[in-house]
Amino acid sequence: MSGTVGRFAPSPSGRLHLGNLACSLLAWLSAKHQGGKIVLRIEDLDAERCPRKYADQLEEDLSWLGLVWDEGGSHGGPHGPYYQSECAPVYEEAYAKLAAQGLVYPCFCSRSQLHAASAPHTSDGNVIYPGTCRDLTPEEIAEKRKHKAPAYRVRVPDENVRFVDGCMGPHTENLLRDCGDFYLRRADGVFAYQLAVVVDDARMGVTEVVRGADLLSSTARQLYLYRLLGLKAPRFAHCPLLLAPDGRRLSKRDGDQSLENLRAKYTAEEIVGRLAYVYGLQPEPAPRTPESLITDFSWENVPKEDICLPENLF
């Protein structure tokens, strides 16, 4: 087995949909093609939105599809915990390292205030933070704390971050202009996605991150955190998103594309084969097992643009 370690990192806020399945299939195929393994991590940072029953169902769905993981989830393993809701002490340690570098500051801005400020937005829809609370004095911070609990952000430099994406190719983002100072922790104490995934991927030995293209803009921020924390960054490959036939992005609200409904109509091999077809891994939508796709898998065959599902394919 090679040293490649990929991962499934779903957020169990509902049943999987086709987009989640496609990402999982590509992550699994990429790791297995290299003779590597797959870790399953449950990204349930917001535990109220992610009841354990969805995580259990998610494991059953992945197993049914033939996307068997080697470590993590309810199976456990040497790099637990594998549920982010159980990892607060681990994140706290990394957060303290960043705070000790003088890079963390409290932010009292509300979401509505940020959107009302007409600040530019990142490609994933977030506001590029204008630095409103970046240079508050200790007195100003103390006064604001009387009225509102702050979230916490990390300072970023005016610096370009360059990397070569395994699917999308060369990519550059400026941390200050394209991202802005970003959240590490919410006002309610929950740690932010950017910090949690960096800490978890590093401690689980993940060497390859495969995820949707909607997270491409997160990569520069995460590479910055890897550097600050002295951790080795993985390779990244961002796969094109699946769109409904009318061009809408798929979501867990699209019940017709959820695995619950798909399982009632198709076999696992039919679902895998049709996904392999739209992602350029085979010339026709014939039924396939995941194992049968390993040998010929190549990122060169995967499209670079978002994929509109053909009518009546599912």
What are these regions (language model features)?
Residues 82-97, 121-127, 148-158, 278-293:
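Short secondary-structure transition/capping segments
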Residues 70-73, 233-236, 282-288:
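Short, surface-exposed acidic
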Residues 96-100, 202, 263, 276:
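Alpha-helix boundary recognition
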Residues 46-56, 244-246, 295-303:
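Short, mixed-charge aromatic SLiMs
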Residues 1-15, 38, 65, 142-143, ...:
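Non-catalytic terminal extensions that flank enzyme cores
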Residues 1-118, 122, 213-214, 218-231, ...:
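N-terminal Rossmann-like or analogous alpha/beta NTP/dinucleotide-binding catalytic cores
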Residues 112-251, 258-262, 311-314:
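Active-site cores that bind ATP or allylic diphosphates and position pyrophosphate for catalysis
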Residues 55, 88, 111-114, 126, ...:
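Alpha-helix initiation and N-capping motif
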